[in-house]
Regions:
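ATP-binding N-terminal substructure of ATP-dependent carboxylate-amine bond-forming enzymes
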Residues: 1-100, 104
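Active-site nucleotide/adenylate-binding loops and adjacent lid/helix of ATP-dependent enzymes
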Residues: 98-192
Length: 192
């Protein structure tokens, strides 16, 4: 039996793959997920169903694991920060705060001298009219958008008038570019 137990927040496809990989290395896994039907529970050594903001269940989870990771970026920052006070969270919560907000993520990538499509923060409909030069473009929610959710294609300026969206949340408008290929890349480092 393994001496190491990894706690995984989220129970989807990536959590399932992580559990399968850990099993090959004789590492135990505990899944914590807000979906009682999460597929990763079928591959984990243990499964805890609960809301990501339920401190009692989160503390129970903390007591069962040695280190914690997460399989998707929309885990509340406060939850990761709480866990990190007791067990190491990888990637660090501060990283997650960046990747779960599209504008922070783009700004961070640009500060690393990596090019992106042109973009601008949109807080109200008039901001769209002030940034016509970025149309055609994609208007995206800054938070909680994935797989096309929270995205609105603007082919021409007249599409702005037809938008029926809630401007109580922040958006990002990205200039459409002609892609030849799209890659998803994960970088990691071990140690310092």
């Amino acid at each position: 039996m393994s001496e190491l137990t990894i706690g995984i927040l989220g129970g989807g496809q990536l959590g399932s793959l992580l559990c399968l990989g850990a099993k090959k290395l004789n590492i135990n896994t505990v899944i914590y997920c807000d979906d009682k039907d999460a597929p990763a529970q079928n591959y984990a050594n243990a499964f805890i169903f609960g809301d990501y903001k339920d401190e009692i269940k989160i503390k129970d989870f903390i007591n069962k694991v040695d280190i914690v990771t997460y399989e998707f970026e929309n885990i509340p920052f406060e939850t990761l920060d709480l866990i990190n006070q007791f067990k190491e969270v990888k990637p660090k919560p501060a990283i997650n705060k960046i990747v779960q907000h599209r504008l922070y993520e783009k700004d961070f990538i640009n500060k690393c001298n990596i090019g992106t499509a042109r973009y601008v923060s949109i807080k109200e409909k008039s901001d769209l009219n002030s940034n016509i030069k970025l149309i055609p473009g994609i208007l995206k929610t800054c938070r909680l958008g994935y797989d096309g959710k929270g995205q609105y294609k603007l082919n021409n300026p007249s599409d702005i008038e037809n938008l029926n969206i809630d401007f109580s949340q922040e958006y990002i408008l990205e200039k459409m570019i002609n892609l030849k290929k799209e890659f998803s890349i994960i970088l990691t480092r071990f140690g310092h």
